[in-house]
C-alpha cells in the first residue's frame, strides 16, 4: 500500500506555540517525530492517544506528545495538507 505524504501548513498560533515549547526546554525532537509520522500518513502509536476533537475544534484531531504536551492538527485529504494548528499544555490550549 502506498503511503500518502502531506505538505505542511502552519497556523500563526502554532508557530508561537512552537517557540514557547523551545523556551520551555521541551524535547522538540519528540514533536518532530510525531509530525513526521503524520506527514507520511502513518498511524500514531497508542501512547500518543490520537483522537477527534469536538466543540470549537470539530474537524481537528489531538494527540499527546507527552502527558501534558499536545498537538492539535487537521488533515485535509482532498488537498493533501497537514495543518498544524496548536501545540502546548492542556491549560495553554483549553484553559483547563
Q: What is each PLM-predicted segment?
A:
Residues 17, 33-34:
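A ubiquitous structural signal for well-ordered alpha-helices
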Residues 36-64:
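A short, surface-exposed loop/turn module that caps and links secondary-structure elements
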Residues 1-7, 13-16, 23-29, 63-65, ...:
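Enriched for short, Lys/Arg-rich terminal
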Amino acid at each position: 500500500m502506498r503511503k500518502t505524504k502531506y505538505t505542511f501548513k502552519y497556523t500563526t498560533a502554532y508557530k508561537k506555540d512552537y517557540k514557547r515549547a523551545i523556551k520551555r526546554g521541551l524535547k522538540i525532537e519528540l514533536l518532530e517525530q510525531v509530525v513526521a509520522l503524520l506527514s507520511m500518513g502513518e498511524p500514531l502509536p497508542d501512547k500518543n492517544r490520537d483522537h477527534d476533537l469536538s466543540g470549537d475544534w470539530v474537524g481537528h484531531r489531538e494527540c499527546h506528545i507527552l502527558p501534558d504536551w499536545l498537538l492539535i492538527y487537521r488533515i485535509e485529504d482532498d488537498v493533501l495538507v497537514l495543518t498544524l494548528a496548536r501545540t502546548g499544555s492542556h491549560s495553554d490550549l483549553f484553559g483547563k
